[in-house]
Amino acid sequence: MSDNLSQADILARVAATLESRKPENGGDPEKSYVAKLFKKGDDAILKKIGEEATETVMAAKDARAADLADEAVSKVVYEVADLWFHTMVLLARIGRTPEDVVNELARREGLSGLVEKASRKE
C-alpha cells in the first residue's frame, strides 16, 4: 500500500473506478471485466460473490490445515480481496459505497453482538 494513501482512500478509489465502469457512465463491456458484470446484471454479480465466498472458505480451511503457513494465509487474504472486490461491485450496482459499510460497522462498534442481532427487524 502506498504511504500516501489510507485504507479508506484505496476503498474510495476502487469504488470510483467501479462507478466509472457502469454502462451509464461509459463502461465498455468489451474492455472491462466490471462493465461486463454490470451488463450481465445482478445474477452474474451474485454468482461471482458466491464463488468468491466459497473460495475464501476453502482457502481458510486449507490455511488451518497447513498450520497457518504464510503461503496458505496469503491465499486467504487473496481470496478475501476477491470477495471484497465483488461485494463492492454489488454495492455500486445498488447505489451504495464502502463508506456506507464502514458507517454501519461504526454504528455497531461497541455493541454486543447479541444485542445488535436482537435489534434487527425480522
UniProtKB/Swiss-Prot annotation:
One of its GO terms (biological process) is L-histidine biosynthetic process. It comes from the Bacteria. It is found in: Cytoplasm. Pathway: Amino-acid biosynthesis; L-histidine biosynthesis; L-histidine from 5-phospho-alpha-D-ribose 1-diphosphate: step 2/9. Pfam families: PRA-PH (PF01503). It catalyses: 1-(5-phospho-beta-D-ribosyl)-ATP + H2O = 1-(5-phospho-beta-D-ribosyl)-5'-AMP + diphosphate + H(+). Keywords: Amino-acid biosynthesis, ATP-binding, Cytoplasm, Histidine biosynthesis, Hydrolase, Nucleotide-binding. Its EC number is 3.6.1.31. InterPro entries: HisE, PRib-ATP_PPHydrolase-like. GO terms for cellular component: cytoplasm. GO terms for molecular function: ATP binding; phosphoribosyl-ATP diphosphatase activity. Belongs to the PRA-PH family. This is Phosphoribosyl-ATP pyrophosphatase. The lineage of its organism: Bacteria, Pseudomonadati, Pseudomonadota, Betaproteobacteria, Burkholderiales. The gene is hisE.
